[in-house]
């Protein structure tokens, strides 16, 4: 599964407010998150990631901790579920 590309968050839940409004996953497993209007702190600012299974990815969060997430890709919609059960979605921009 390939996460490479630019993504825009399309979910607006209370639990996902600390995840970036936009994120770009690079081929060399790095990512860069971008804050949206009114976002003060984002967990995914910049760092590394590793796909560890067909539906699991480990992402380096702002504290440098490596955190596992479940994910799925359906068409151009990428869905993540964090360890607290928060589900949030991104739409592929490019």
Segments predicted by a language model, with ranges:
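N-terminal glycine/threonine-rich, aromatic-flanked beta-hairpin/loop signature
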Residues: 15-57
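N-terminal helix-cap/turn-to-beta initiation motif at the start of protein domains
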Residues: 1-6
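The phosphoinositide-binding surface of pleckstrin homology
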Residues: 8-12
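Beta-sheet ligand-binding and adhesion/scaffold domains
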Residues: 13-14, 22, 56-94
């Amino acid at each position: 599964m390939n996460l490479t590309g630019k993504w825009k968050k399309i979910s607006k839940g209370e639990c996902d407010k600390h995840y970036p409004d936009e994120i770009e996953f690079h081929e060399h497993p790095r990512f860069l998150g971008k804050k949206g209007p009114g976002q003060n702190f984002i967990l995914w600012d910049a760092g590394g990631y590793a796909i560890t299974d067909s539906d699991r990815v480990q992402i380096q969060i702002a504290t440098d901790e490596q955190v596992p997430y479940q994910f799925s890709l359906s068409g151009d919609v990428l869905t993540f579920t964090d360890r607290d059960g928060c589900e949030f979605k991104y739409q592929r921009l490019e």
